[in-house]
């Protein structure tokens, strides 16, 4: 994947403003609320019976932070995303059996969360760079499935 200097700047510039805990929790909660079938991967998280329960669930919050922290590794390693996510791809494929389509869904949700939090900074060019990034990350995570 080739990243232009502008794309790298748009991605890293916005990432520097992201509160990983808050945006991660919001992104994972939105995924579970908007796509309720994804809850089956989080059965150990306790009460996911309503949007209020999901948003208030400390395990959702903690895992959302973990997911977005991991996503930060992609931002730090834009030129080596495939290798950065090799172990996570293996884990999600072999042990967790997560449908790789869910990576794309979470990427789309992350775009919505970023746009909501950073509306002034989230220009069409910024969105294009982030769409490319979430596609590349989703592809890297789905790699072990092929």
Swiss-Prot record:
Gene3D superfamilies: Globins
One Gene Ontology biological process: hydrogen peroxide catabolic process
Keywords: Heme, Iron, Metal-binding, Oxygen transport, Transport
GO molecular function: haptoglobin binding; heme binding; metal ion binding; organic acid binding; oxygen binding; oxygen carrier activity; peroxidase activity
InterPro entries in UniProt: Globin, Globin-like_sf, Globin/Proto, Hemoglobin_b, Hemoglobin_oxygen_transport
Domain Globin: 2-146
Iron found in the keyword field: yes
Tissue: Red blood cells.
SUPFAM superfamilies membership: Globin-like
Positions contributing to heme b binding: 63, 92
GO cellular component: blood microparticle; haptoglobin-hemoglobin complex; hemoglobin complex
Family as reported in the entry's similarity comment: Belongs to the globin family.
Record function comment: Involved in oxygen transport from the lung to the various peripheral tissues.
Self-association state and partner proteins as the record states: Heterotetramer of two alpha chains and two beta chains.
Identification of the protein by name: Hemoglobin subunit beta
Organism: Anseranas semipalmata
């Amino acid at each position: 994947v080739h990243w232009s200097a502008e794309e790298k700047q748009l991605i890293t510039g916005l990432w520097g403003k992201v509160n990983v805990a808050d945006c991660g929790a919001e992104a994972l909660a939105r995924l579970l609320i908007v796509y309720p079938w994804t809850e089956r991967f989080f059965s150990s998280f306790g009460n996911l019976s309503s949007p209020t329960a999901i948003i208030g669930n400390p395990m959702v919050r903690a895992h959302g932070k973990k997911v977005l922290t991991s996503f930060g590794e992609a931002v730090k390693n834009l030129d080596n995303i495939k290798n950065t996510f090799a172990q996570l791809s293996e884990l999600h494929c072999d042990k967790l059996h997560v449908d790789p389509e869910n990576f794309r869904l979470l990427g789309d949700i992350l775009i919505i969360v970023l746009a909501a939090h950073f509306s002034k900074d989230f220009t069409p060019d910024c969105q294009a760079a982030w769409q490319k990034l979430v596609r590349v990350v989703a592809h890297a995570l789905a790699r072990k499935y092929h």
